[in-house]
Amino acid sequence: MFEALNGWTDAPNAIATVVSTRVMPPFVAVCMAAVLNLVGALSGTAVAATIGKGVIDIDSGISLQTVACGALGVVVWGGFCVYLKLPVSKSHGLLSGLAGAAVQEIGFDALIWDGWSKVFEGMAFSLFAGFVGAFVVMTVIIWIFHKAQPSGMRRNFGHLQIFSSAFMAWSHGTSDGQKAMGAMALALSLIHI
């Protein structure tokens, strides 16, 4: 349920621009996003490893019900926010849900603090890198194209939109696809599979 909610609310963002500007037909854009999400999910294990064994100590005595409660909490919270049209991060929600359920069952000893420091560093870095990257890219675009006619730029930026949409779909797979795999790995490790 968690990954279905996550895909329903987050995955369309990767193709929204190319579909709304009619650079790609919806069917082609959805197919591209599906393939690249899968490729992204299978292209690494860093996120899955962090979620699966880097933030919650499976030897602390947490149960499979703990993982289920953490995931269910995200589904309820995410569905509630979607219903009210509020922005929500299922990544933060999953981590918080798993942590909250583990702390409720075992206490703070269930948390792996080194793993949490990596998570918080990643969050802080992504905010900073996103701001700086967007600022630099926008500055370069304005500087290069400030005298260009908008009508002539549609085709060029259309190709760039396809590239950025493809990259967003792949990135969504590397992050959110692996996040779900990590939660499943955590659950499977609790039942010793």
Segments predicted by a language model, with ranges:
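Membrane-interface alpha-helices at helix entry/exit sites of multi-pass transporters
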Residues: R22-A34
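C-terminal ends of transmembrane helices
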Residues: V75-L86, I142-H146
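Conserved small/polar residues in nucleotide/adenosyl-binding loops
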Residues: I191-I193
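Structural signature of hydrophobic alpha-helical transmembrane segments
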Residues: E3, S60-A71
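Short, non-helical or kinked segments that cap or interrupt transmembrane helices
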Residues: W8-I15, V23, L84-S96, G177-M184
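Transmembrane alpha-helix boundary signature
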Residues: L42-G54, Y83-P87, I106-I112, T139
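Membrane interface segments of multi-pass transport proteins and intramembrane proteases
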Residues: I141-N156
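Mid-bilayer segments of alpha-helical transmembrane spans in multi-pass integral membrane proteins
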Residues: V75, G79, L98-G107, M123, ...
